[in-house]
Amino acid sequence: MGKLVALVLLGVGLSLVGEMFLAFRERVNASREVEPVEPENCHLIEELESGSEDIDILPSGLAFISSGLKYPGMPNFAPDEPGKIFLMDLNEQNPRAQALEISGGFDKELFNPHGISIFIDKDNTVYLYVVNHPHMKSTVEIFKFEEQQRSLVYLKTIKHELLKSVNDIVVLGPEQFYATRDHYFTNSLLSFFEMILDLRWTYVLFYSPREVKVVAKGFCSANGITVSADQKYVYVADVAAKNIHIMEKHDNWDLTQLKVIQLGTLVDNLTVDPATGDILAGCHPNPMKLLNYNPEDPPGSEVLRIQNVLSEKPRVSTVYANNGSVLQGTSVASVYHGKILIGTVFHKTLYCEL
């Protein structure tokens, strides 16, 4: 009798899991395909073959690119190679990417870079903050950029018990930043069920040497984060919920949600067009192809522009869309003077002149 009860309970449990998985597939638009939107003047960057998960561009046009991310459940074309930070000068007629040398005693063999953020100090010194996943844990690395030598000098590693499963950061002061946590569980299997169950246990935290605190919570999977040009508002992408949260920043660093913009596609990293204040979002139109990678039927790419962010009816338009024949798994798009760099989690990088 006990075995029969156990079998019945197992059957009920498996049935519930199956129903939840089907609901998850529907929730994330698993079978969605995109109509192509491709600017005419585009080409792939030869030097970037192992992803360009995040991109941040200085006002001078120098673009920093994180490459080589190894992330649970995602493809990787160079699993034995450590990650790198690349630099591109978008002022050049035919910009190329070069890997930046890192000095200062940093363990480059364990470098697994994810989200990045630039901070320019009052004396114009440029610092690069990098989310790193050595041994699949989460730290934030601080580097100083040496422009003449085109290199990075390692300064410091930040660790904290709240800095777990960190995805992205945006730096607003010396060692002062917001960071997103994309999964509550760090175990791959548990984090998978976390998404299926739509638990919404992830959050945004604020870090400073004096204070570390959760400032926004209730996200399914808090992902990309950036700040408005005037630094009054913080934008947070909830990738599995397919939306962007518009948050007001207060003097004590707390955040208050003003609105949520639904996009109907899985939103990864966010950047702001410095010329217009528009949000650019790198998106995943068909995530199941990303999780179950098949080179014969690859995941597509999508970049959206969100205009009039604070208005009652923001305008959403497609900047780029491809079925995976050119670019797979778009994670970010960043613009500079009519030029756009489109990065991916594990694939190539596209440069276009708009």
Swiss-Prot record:
GO terms for molecular function: acyl-L-homoserine-lactone lactonohydrolase activity; aryldialkylphosphatase activity; arylesterase activity; metal ion binding; protein homodimerization activity. Its cofactor is Ca(2+). It holds the Pfam family Arylesterase. GO terms for biological process: carboxylic acid catabolic process; establishment of localization in cell; lactone catabolic process; negative regulation of superoxide anion generation; regulation of cellular response to drug; renal sodium ion transport; response to toxic substance. Keywords: Calcium, Disulfide bond, Glycoprotein, Hydrolase, Metal-binding, Phosphoprotein, Secreted, Signal. InterPro entries: 6-blade_b-propeller_TolB-like (IPR011042), Arylesterase (IPR002640), Paraoxonase2 (IPR008364), Serum_paraoxonase/arylesterase (IPR051288). The signal sequence is not cleaved. Ca(2+) 1 binds at residues 53, 167, 223, 268-269. Disulfide bonds join 42-352. Glycans are attached at residues 29, 269, 323. It catalyses: a phenyl acetate + H2O = a phenol + acetate + H(+); An aryl dialkyl phosphate + H2O = dialkyl phosphate + an aryl alcohol; an N-acyl-L-homoserine lactone + H2O = an N-acyl-L-homoserine + H(+). It is found in: Secreted, Extracellular space. Gene3D superfamilies: TolB, C-terminal domain. The keyword Cell inner membrane does not apply. Binds 2 calcium ions per subunit. One of its GO terms (cellular component) is extracellular exosome. Ca(2+) 2 binds at residues 54, 116, 168. It comes from the Eukaryota. The modification Phosphoserine is found at residue 165. Has low activity towards the organophosphate paraxon and aromatic carboxylic acid esters. Rapidly hydrolyzes lactones such as statin prodrugs (e.g. lovastatin). Hydrolyzes aromatic lactones and 5- or 6-member ring lactones with aliphatic substituents but not simple lactones or those with polar substituents. Belongs to the paraoxonase family. Homodimer. This is Serum paraoxonase/lactonase 3. The gene is PON3.
